[in-house]
Amino acid sequence: MFAEYGVLNYWTYLVGAIFIVLVPGPNTLFVLKNSVGRGVKGGYLAACGVFIGDAILMFLAYAGVATLIKTTPVLFNIVRYLGAFYLLYLGAKILYATLTSKGRAATETVVPFGAIFKRALILSLTNPKAILFYVSFFVQFIDVTAPHTGVSFFILATTLEIVSFCYLSFLILSGAFVTHYIGTKKKLAKVGNSLIGLLFVGFAARLATLQS
């Protein structure tokens, strides 16, 4: 399928894309948190930020920025530490809001919907490993002798975005359903938010120690 457009082993790529999307990461966790805390609208706003951020990274990967980042340690480290700092900031913010909330559930903390989108977008864009991954993964399924490799790259990128949309939609709808349950379980909500905050701190530490 899509062989005429320079795509190699599309079905193998699709299976790989599904497994990649299923691996939990900060983007997925952020979408899930907002779907639980702000419902379907909050979840999809976070997902839109992730989709647009990923699309930008995929375009940059195709444009050759990935090679520049990989061969320029200073640039890689700047993006890496910015990403780690932002993850740490989000984790600390969640933990602080959870631990300082008293007479109400932590999920009631109001965050403007616009801020949810912006945070998701920044979270997606400040991951230097993502852009390097797109190149290393996509190149395995592109016929470099094809006349228009841009079309091949676009097909693979679109496929990954569709798979991501389906998975995140499942998380959003599930999270919104869970909201009705934990809405009356303040202790459970606090424990859940605390775990999410700690996971963001953990992601920050892992990103800060990654090498190009």
From Swiss-Prot:
GO terms for cellular component: plasma membrane. It is found in: Cell inner membrane. It comes from the Bacteria. It is a multi-pass membrane protein. Pfam families: LysE. It catalyses: L-leucine(in) + H(+)(out) = L-leucine(out) + H(+)(in). GO terms for biological process: L-leucine transport. GO terms for molecular function: antiporter activity; L-leucine transmembrane transporter activity. Keywords: Amino-acid transport, Antiport, Cell inner membrane, Cell membrane, Membrane, Transmembrane, Transmembrane helix, Transport. Belongs to the Rht family. Exporter of leucine. This is Leucine efflux protein.
